[in-house]
Amino acid sequence: MVRPAQVRALSGLARSATFVRLLPSQSQNALRCASLPVSRLGALPLRATTQITSAPLRQWHQIRNSSATATASLAEQAAADPEGLSQAEIISNIDAEEWKRISKVRNIGIAAHIDSGKTTATERVLFYTGRINAIHEVRGRDSVGAKMDSMDLEREKGITIQSAATFCDWVKKENGKEEKYHFNLIDTPGHIDFTIEVERALRVLDGAVMILCAVSGVQSQTITVDRQMKRYNVPRISFVNKMDRMGANPFKAIDQINNKLKLPAAAVQVPIGAEDEFQGVVDLIRMKAIYNEGPRGETIVEKDEIPEHIKPLAEERRRILIETLADVDDEIAEIFLDEREPTIEQIKAAIRRATIALKFTPVFMGSALADKSIQPMLDGVCDYLPNPSEVTNLALDQKRKEAQVKLLPYGSQPFVGLAFKLEESNFGQLTYIRVYQGTLRKGANVFNARNDKKVKVPRIVRMHSNEMEEVQEIGAGEICAVFGVDCASGDTFTDGQLAYTMSSMFVPEPVISLSIKPKNNKDSANFSKAMARFQREDPTFRVSYDTESEQTIISGMGELHLDIYVERMRREYKVDCETGQPQVAYRETIGRRVEFDHLLKKQSGGPGDYARVVGWMEPSESLEENKFEEQIVGGAISEKFLFACEKGFNLACEKGPLIGHKVLGTKMVINDGATHMTDSSEMSFKNATQQAFRKAFMESQPHVLEPLMKTVVTAPIEFQGDVIGLLNKRNATINDSEIGVDEFTVYADCSLNGMFGFSSHLRAATQGKGEYTMEFSHYEKAPGQLQKELVQKYLKAQADRHKK
């Protein structure tokens, strides 16, 4: 509530639209009637402005100058004290025309477990918003495939591999009013091997729709997506899909969101019928029945009469909704304690506040395949997910030791944008950019913060899957794609006025590798081109060259991940490849504390090598990291040489002496040493440290570590015994299991080495009805027999190379 004193204080300058944004909508409307917004006045033609008397003209200049001063002041505070600057203050200073645009923008992603219906739902969204004229299904039964699956591979396999970006407009109709919203929409993969695509999408989005299956509820990849959303503070609404499936139970899914994801959730709808008899939903906020009519459900019919048999359920679930909101929102809590009934507006406002604050997710329900209840979910995106100005975005100022700064969603501010995805198109490299601050214009020069390289932006396009639409400029909060900008995924661009960089995305380490080479030497040039392009596009796809085996090694997140790239090379570059057996990314670690006193001494007449290092090695506190410490007293080794020692330690950790894999969980301490006046050098100390490391490591009873994978297997219930048997054969540790109406799920930790070929065995054991996902969990000591085999194999390979 706005008090009279506040309204008086907000008179004068505060009546301009630039200061009105903090007030509730009723007060905004009252104040806006009192004066013409600054931006509109500034846009009047000359003959109109000349008719304004001198006093109002002076007042207008004062208002305009005051607005510019306020923006400059906020920009200073955003850099000096980002935590002290609230989003409310930022929003209050947005120009009226800019607010009109940005308040109706929603940057949203659709994410979920594989086969939950993400792409099917997106296809309906595009159809109902008028972006496409016909609906095509995912698995290409009509030989077309879903619009958002633009790669041939995606259409064949029925999965989404890359994040497809599109935009569409949705007209929200309520109480006889129509409001047009602009969606930038990203459809993401559900398969765990393509998790980097989900990471990249969530990094640049302001909100998300989390889709769950009404039968399976929260699944393994749902938990991964939840973790990613929490990492990037992405608010979400939830949509329980497949309500027409046998065994559909949306309330089980809601319980799992509450219990498994630890996120307060409540239904904002209840179904009218279920399974084959699913007809529509009841809106619990307005207590209206909603049905879809028309050949593809394009017509929404609302009825005040709720079916009698649904009323008790609707009333019970509405009570639960209000109780849940009372736990996460102070205003509803106060109303609840006073035993008053909240109004529709109060409930909707509370859901919006709690959702944006990451305290709550409203749950919608429907069936994308049956064309039911998608439109109310789109209204939910408008009502409950934030616009770009309501989300805090931070950058790092390189000129101030990477101090955090808050970005302002103002078109007048210096441009800052993030390249979050790269694609190769027929017209060259396509770079997807999210504009966080300022305006990106066609023909403008932008600077890459990573290498300070200046590039010109020749074309700006909005993408619709693999089609495009050219635009002249893109404002703050929008997503676009540009041509002719050479960069890497995760690069920050500015207009040169600021030395800002965005914090980078989390990129998981690869867990599987294999050797690869083209079958024909004439394809080597295309092979190299493909490798370079795939690395630029996907940070989880790594390429290296093993000098000892003289092989090119590719590494990634799983077998499917690498298979897709091998297949893409064949299709897109006409390069057939030979691949070796998949190799597990083992690690090595120290077994116990070992002391060392190592002297490197080489003198041959001229300048020689001399370095003595003394200290010890021991297991570090965390298995995940290596640690180097110096405890030199009295300057026995100079700072310059100690830096070389640390470099030698890091190099030694890259390739362990036991089986040639990276070293983890090892700490090295140097506490004494000696130097020679002429023969000591940085190279001497680097080499001495590496030699001391190798010797001490092999004396420490070292261990091989193998990656354990968090594995989730789902199959029809009649195959439970066969699946458990398959896992036991692979020495899996079964952590948990769930039994549903017609299927069961097993959660286990499995050795990656034992899981090669598991997919074909699972298909055979379950008649093709089982599915599984694997995600890296942690490293654990390998069995003694496996370690012995790996060491023997490594020693034999070393001996064979020496013979050559």
UniProtKB/Swiss-Prot annotation:
Q: What cellular component GO annotations does this protein have?
A: mitochondrion
Question: Where's the transit peptide in this chain?
Answer: 1-9
Matching CDD domains: EF-G (cd01886), EFG_III (cd16262), EFG_mtEFG1_IV (cd01434), mtEFG1_II_like (cd04091)
Q: Biological process (GO) annotations?
A: mitochondrial translational elongation
Transport: present as a keyword of the record? Answer: no
Name one matching Pfam family: EFG_III
> Which keywords does the record carry?
Elongation factor, GTP-binding, Mitochondrion, Nucleotide-binding, Protein biosynthesis, Transit peptide
- Tell where it localizes: Mitochondrion
Chain positions recorded as GTP binding sites = 112-119, 187-191, 241-244
HAMAP family linked: EF_G_EF_2_B
Q: State the family named in the UniProt similarity comment for this chain.
A: Belongs to the TRAFAC class translation factor GTPase superfamily. Classic translation factor GTPase family. EF-G/EF-2 subfamily.
User: Briefly, what is this protein's role?
Assistant: Mitochondrial GTPase that catalyzes the GTP-dependent ribosomal translocation step during translation elongation. During this step, the ribosome changes from the pre-translocational (PRE) to the post-translocational (POST) state as the newly formed A-site-bound peptidyl-tRNA and P-site-bound deacylated tRNA move to the P and E sites, respectively. Catalyzes the coordinated movement of the two tRNA molecules, the mRNA and conformational changes in the ribosome.
Q: Which PANTHER family match?
A: ELONGATION FACTOR G, MITOCHONDRIAL
Full protein name: Elongation factor G, mitochondrial
Organism field: Talaromyces stipitatus (strain ATCC 10500 / CBS 375.48 / QM 6759 / NRRL 1006) (Penicillium stipitatum)
Gene encoding this chain? Answer: mef1
